[in-house]
Amino acid sequence: GKSMQLIEENDNKFKVLLDKYKYCRDKKLAVKYRQEAKSFLHRLNELLSNQLGLCKNEITFSDICIFPFVRQFAFVDYEWFLNCQLDNLNDWLQKFLNSELFKKVMQKHAIYEH
């Protein structure tokens, strides 16, 4: 269904552009990759215009799968991301970033040594 299509597009197209954008040393090329990836972000933003999740009016598997990649993309140049008129997507991102589960998962721990 729609959920698997989104996840496949994320994994097979968006993730490729994210990596090219994030690790690109050539500024002009990075901007090109960012623009190419932006169409996927706009689609996600549109999906969130009248519901809480990407596929339903609640957070589902697809949201959890796609969130880490949107987070990575946003933090390459967060100021740029905030100025992209992706308000629904940014609100969705903030809900994840502020969730207790995310805070627990991202806690820093001492390095385990045995």
Q: Can you annotate each of these PLM segments?
A:
Residues 18, 70, 102:
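Catalytic cores of transferase enzymes with a strong primary signal for eukaryotic protein kinases
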Residues 1-39, 49-52:
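GST-like domain detector, emphasizing the conserved glutathione-binding G-site
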Residues 15, 41-45, 97:
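Structural signal for well-ordered, non-membrane alpha-helices
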Residues 46-57, 100-106:
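Surface-exposed helix-capping loop/turn segments at secondary-structure junctions
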Residues 33-40, 44, 69, 92:
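Alpha-helical packing segments of well-folded alpha/beta enzyme cores
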Residues 108-114:
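Long, charge-rich low-complexity segments
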Residues 54-79, 85, 90, 96:
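GST superfamily/GST-like fold recognition
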